[in-house]
């Protein structure tokens, strides 16, 4: 994905950049292949192959939403050499960098849509029971700017 066009019922459109497009795919559960590029411990770019991603979106309280993403990845099959030794493992620091990369993509998607008053993750459907008819009348503008959004990423390496 290089860009994604998001449209609303009112006909507004917003073009998401590459990172935000991938973030949307992670939350929608539609990114089950491809790679995640990150900076390795040796300051070189490395990548892992995505095997599976699952996301559960939950609303906690009146204005806080959390996306919990579980990723299954595998190391790239091509080992790299460093100081004459074959290196094909992922350190804890590298796992954190992978988590930060995915989290950044998801947050970028939410923030771009929040600025445009678009509820990209359909958080309003989860808030409807709390807000009632006020939510129906002003679906996007009533609440989306007040939502605090966070993403928790869990990576499992095969």
Residue ranges and their predicted role:
Residues 1-158:
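Membrane-proximal alpha-helical signals and transmembrane carboxylates
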